[in-house]
Regions:
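Beta-hairpin "wing" of winged helix-turn-helix
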Residues: 54-63, 67-69
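Alpha-helical residues within the helix-turn-helix
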Residues: 34, 51-52
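Key DNA-contact positions within bacterial/archaeal DNA-binding proteins
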Residues: 41
Length: 180
């Protein structure tokens, strides 16, 4: 397995927001984590970042949870990446061009003047990646996902979340904890 540019947090955020985009009611972090088999504490931290970036908003109460803060077609993938994994760069230049064994202690001006060509190349690649990610929305991902999954899967997913919410509300009304 190779190292990735973006961490698991980005994957968790995008999958969770995809779910929020397809649900008719707020969804709790606990339910999102349980549904996807991912760590709840980590997902809660991700949702704090998403909320601070105004991509999701929280709804209070035992039947509460999170909803998208704006329509899925108005949330681009780059916004999610910036919220969850801010400051991540495709490439970090260590300026090794000045360390060539042939240069000794003083590299010639031609070797170190201007920007490093490798760095400039990688910055261009990063700009193109960011432009692509900014051109794709959460709604695009929902559409692609919906085309792949059978129609009944959307109903089953909605039912799974509604059943969890009903169970939580019933436990709260019976005097137990509403949390799962």
């Amino acid at each position: 397995m190779s190292a990735s540019m973006y961490g698991a947090g980005v994957e968790y955020a995008l999958h969770s927001m995809l779910i929020l985009a397809t649900q008719s009611a707020p969804v709790s972090v606990s339910d999102l984590a349980g549904y996807q088999g991912i760590p709840e504490r980590f997902l809660a931290k991700i949702f704090t970042r998403l909320k601070n970036a105004r991509l999701v908003k929280g709804m209070e109460g035992v039947a509460g949870g999170f909803v998208l803060a704006k329509p899925a077609e108005n949330i681009d993938v780059m916004e999610v990446l910036r919220a969850v994994d801010p400051g991540r760069s495709l490439f970090t230049c260590a300026e090794i061009r000045q360390n060539c064994a042939l240069f000794g202690e003083t590299p010639p001006g031609w070797a170190v003047s201007g920007p490093c060509r490798i760095h400039a190349f990688m910055e261009e690649a990063e700009r193109k990646l960011q432009t692509f990610l900014a051109s794709r929305t959460l709604a695009d991902l929902v559409c692609e996902y919906s085309c792949k999954a059978p129609k009944k899967f959307a109903r089953e997913t909605e039912g799974w979340f509604l059943d969890r919410k009903k169970d939580r509300v019933a436990r709260r009304q019976a005097g137990g904890s509403g949390e799962l």
